[in-house]
A protein has these predicted regions:
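Glycine-aromatic micro-motifs
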Residues: 1-143
Length: 143
């Protein structure tokens, strides 16, 4: 079994969630969860989120539990979406790391998470105070 903590466009009902189930006859298991020690940000346009380590903050998301077969099909697609190359991990938009998360049923487990990489650090950002992409403030209006 492999776990993935999603906090943005990969969460159920969001634009990229279908990637979690491509190429598999069965669906992974989904549970609401929290990751401590992270802050959630949106790029300036508000089109995508990213997480960074930040003591004292937490983010809400979904813990997705895959079978080994499901993960072998899903993770290359997810790495491509997130601009993560395991052969060159510091070169993309995101880094894939293991992080301790807690489900709403109080189960604690390690899960893969995509954290902001060095390329994202160069973009203007906005803190999502709620720590929940689904409850974020509206994007700023551009004139």
């Amino acid at each position: 079994m492999e776990n993935l903590f999603t906090y943005g466009t990969l969460r159920p009902g969001c634009p990229n969630a279908d990637l979690l189930e491509l190429g598999s006859a069965s669906k992974p298991r989904y549970e609401s969860a929290t990751a401590q020690g992270l802050a959630l940000y949106a790029n300036y346009s508000g089109s995508f989120p990213y997480a960074r380590p930040h003591p004292g903050r937490s983010i809400r998301g979904t813990l997705v539990t895959f079978t080994t077969e499901q993960w072998s099909k899903a993770h290359p697609l997810l790495d491509a979406l997130e601009g993560y190359d395991p052969q060159r991990p510091g070169q993309g938009h995101y880094l894939r790391r293991l992080w301790l998360v807690s489900t709403d049923s109080e189960r604690r487990t390690l899960a893969w998470i995509y954290l902001a990489g060095p390329r994202i650090a160069l973009e203007p950002e906005r803190l999502i105070r709620s720590g929940d992409w689904l409850e974020r403030e509206p994007s700023p209006t551009r004139f």
